Amino acid sequence: PFDLDDVIPTLIGAAYDIPVYHPGIIMEGGSVDFNGAGTLITSTACLLNPNRNPHLTKREIEQYLIDYYGVEHILWVDEGIIGDDTDGHIDDTVRFFKEDSVITVIEHNKQDENYSLLKHNLKQLQEMRLPDDRALTIVELPMPDPIYYNDQRLPASYANFYISNLHVIVPTFRNKRDQEALDILKDCFPEREVVGIDSTDIIWGLGSFHCLSQ
């Protein structure tokens, strides 16, 4: 984190005489996703990476998440996608769209670097249970074809959508799978308008719409 940026919440809190919570953990908003009913999902690739909180065990990190977010149940998948400089933010791989339902990205090309990583995540999701012992309903979302910038693979993913009150803003990539991804998401969010917006010139910054919202 940038030290001067990190001071801003404390200054605002002091100015308005409101409490400020210091969680004591290094993490980013894109590393967690919620079902709105007490369950959080994250990835070991990100939150257990030694470049963040090497002094904390998995159980200690879970306790921080429970205390900070007020959740009761935490689910872990292992992998992120290739090209993600955050080590594996969950907002590129797995997203809740209902209390018991997730969208997970899948790579169908067996030669692609993401194939085995995302297949592993899918297997883990299939074995997970919610607190009431229900299995997750899993909807598979395709990955776009690889996108490169200066020979660097970019973390292009349709899962990096942003949910607003009335809309779901979905990154598209001038790719043959764009419409398929939009159609899947329309089925997942029937009460919202699903809008695809070209993210090709945004993704070179290593994130898309959900990343921008965080």
Question: Regions from the language model: what does each represent?
Answer:
Residues 1-214:
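The feature marks the mature, well-folded catalytic cores of soluble enzymes
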